[in-house]
Amino acid sequence: KGTKGTFALTGATIETVTRGTIQNGTVIISDGKITAVGANVAVPQGATVIDCKGKFIYPGMIDGGSILGLSEVGSDPRTQDYNEVGDVVPQMKALTAVNPNAVAIPVTRISGVTTTLVVPQGGLFPGTASLINLHGYTPDQMYAGFDAVVMNFPTTGRRGFWDRRSDDDIKKAVEKSLGKINEVWEKTIQYHKLDSANKGKVTYY
């Protein structure tokens, strides 16, 4: 876990998002937040100074999709919590299954990744993905304020020379998959109409 206080990272080459590259720059961090960045930044009294000469500082990287915090040991199903039962379960939120104490989280953070989108796996609509910061004691503390329903678009095309299905069989598989998606959309529209007519008081089943 992080350490509180005021820190000054000095003498570094700083790669910024909007201000280009700063040579021999300083970054001030106070109570977990960056408060100053520049080449002529005064070091606050009492700050812990860390000499970063010859090193690079850059914004934390964002992983656009992973099961970090949802999976621990691949051979132990008790540590796997990224695949819920059911093919259409958009109400299942990945955030509720995130383990803040997962060993891979600090390892990933120290490698420069500070944020990741945790994505549920599985069926057509396997759940809702959540953006998390890789620092916090609870899932709510880690939550970065973004959710999105995940849809795994069906893949029914020929997968290689070993796929011996006829063209007609592949066409039928495509139509079946698209029909399933259309069924979900139709049910969603009907639910929305009922929910709107009842002013948001319809119970979800």
In which residue ranges do the predicted regions lie?
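Second-shell loop/turn segments in exported
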Residues: 17, 92-95, 167-171
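Polyanionic/metal-chelating signatures
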Residues: 104, 109-205
